[in-house]
């Protein structure tokens, strides 16, 4: 009898870790996912389409707004406004961007605008206050600056652009660890006043992926948070371009859609709700291409993985000298 109990216990001890491993890897979770095509709806708790949900953006106030310098005439509508998502402590990156791809006076015949989007961090508020007075390019809202508040940061930037700076023809949203060629951005848009891009433009690197159910992942998503087996198509939030009309329609649609933890997925949901198609462009590089001199970046519009401001500055200067930036 004792022998049978021992065998049973041994089997349990062997099977239990396997069950835990299967659960931890999300294999059981996948069995309970809902088919996206048949069941997708958002907000998750509103199947009626009553519009009673809210993004909650109206609860957040701006602490600092841009007061723009005299680098370009204030009364001239911008061809392109760059809204750069930056962490409060990344002042060196912001300074490098001001001197390189974010320089508003880069082109004599094209008006550019630059705005840095920030949350708050107690130990850096004095520095941000000085930076705002010195450069006039800070849009800071009253929320904690943290990775999973990027959706909030993006949408508060979009709210400001939609409500208070809505004369720009196009808007580039981009992270502060990117290399950008403003020249290639303008080439993509069409250099003249008549753009060859659609009136409802939402462009960047488009992904079609599924939620990660691995519980050890930073990007783990539970069924309670998102029960469907794939995401809607989305543009990676590190760098994307919106036309003025697309920005206004996206923001208007977002007002009744609760924020989601991942900003790119959230924008994909909003675009789906607003009926805005996504345009894929390979020259928005999610993974950094090997830099082998300026010619290797001749067509790059934006590239991730430039967290070192000195390196970004060097690459940008070389590409500018070769007429690629």
Curated annotation (Swiss-Prot):
Gene name in the database record: brn
Domain of life the protein comes from: Eukaryota
Name assigned to this protein: Beta-1,3-galactosyltransferase brn
EC number(s) given by UniProt: 2.4.1.62
Described function: Neurogenic protein essential for the development and maintenance of epithelial structure. Required in the germline for establishing the follicular epithelium and for determining the dorsal-ventral polarity. Collaborates with Notch on the apical surface of follicle cells to mediate germline-follicle cell adhesion. Brn has a role in chorion formation.
Membrane topology: Single-pass type II membrane protein
One Pfam match: Galactosyl_T
Glycosylation sites: 149, 166
Positions on the Lumenal side per record topology: 29-325
Record's catalysed reaction(s): a ganglioside GM2 (d18:1(4E)) + UDP-alpha-D-galactose = a ganglioside GM1 (d18:1(4E)) + UDP + H(+)
Biological process per Gene Ontology, one example term: maintenance of polarity of follicular epithelium
Keywords: Developmental protein, Glycoprotein, Glycosyltransferase, Golgi apparatus, Membrane, Notch signaling pathway, Signal-anchor, Transferase, Transmembrane, Transmembrane helix
Similarity comment: Belongs to the glycosyltransferase 31 family.
GO cellular component terms given for this protein: Golgi membrane; Golgi stack
Transmembrane segments: 8-28
UniProt topological domain (Cytoplasmic) ranges: 1-7
Keyword Glycoprotein: yes
GO MF, any single term: beta-1,4-mannosylglycolipid beta-1,3-N-acetylglucosaminyltransferase activity
Enzyme class per UniProt: transferase
Subcellular location: Golgi apparatus membrane
